[in-house]
Amino acid sequence: MRNKEHNFPNQNNNKFEGEPRAKSEYASKRADGTTNTHPQERMRASGERSDFF
């Protein structure tokens, strides 16, 4: 059975507040288009950050 048949809340009007979580320091590419180095360190740092919610 579909969610609409069970009065599932309308999720089309979701609003996200604040700045996006994506930070340039964790990006795989730099602003000039070159590839960022040390991907393991970058991904580990991104996973350990605590600036969400």
From Swiss-Prot:
The keyword Nucleus does not apply. GO terms for biological process: asexual sporulation; sporulation resulting in formation of a cellular spore. Residues 16-32, 39-53 have a biased composition (Basic and acidic residues). It holds the Pfam family SspK. It is found in: Spore core. InterPro entries: SASP_SspK. Signal peptide: none annotated. Induction: Expressed only in the forespore compartment of sporulating cells. Keywords: Sporulation. Belongs to the SspK family. This is Small, acid-soluble spore protein K.
